[in-house]
């Protein structure tokens, strides 16, 4: 198992003994491959530990996780959170830390892939992505960022 950055012992127990313990090595490896700073890695692991503790308290099995669970955690648990151990409570940082967990779970086949969006806006975004890739030669990360912006524009104007 990759070396885990230093976090509070209580949080480390939540992380290594909780429902997401099987995904911790892949998560730590992802942080290492992404060359995240030690401070960021520690904070994100803190956030994953906090989420794992909440999952345990709510008896949510790993195979039931999806974006809705993360939203529920952020909207309903955080505002009244009294968890110990200096648990991370910053919604934006927690969201950033938890999205990769879903990606790892999907890659491992633990949870189903998110359904592909459908409809005219999704079709237009797909065509625009193909154009940015083939005609413009843009990298995947650049395309994702631009697609998020265009999606918000299209949704605000046409949805």
Positions of PLM-derived features:
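Non-catalytic DNA-binding core/recognition domains of DNA-processing enzymes
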Residues: 2-7, 24, 34-109, 138-159
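Intrinsic, low-complexity N-terminal interaction/targeting segments
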Residues: 11, 16-19, 116-120, 124-126, ...
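Helix-boundary capping/turn motifs
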Residues: 17-26, 43-47, 124-125
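Amphipathic alpha-helical segments within well-ordered protein domains
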Residues: 28-32, 52, 129-133
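Charged interaction scaffolds used for protein-protein
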Residues: 110-114
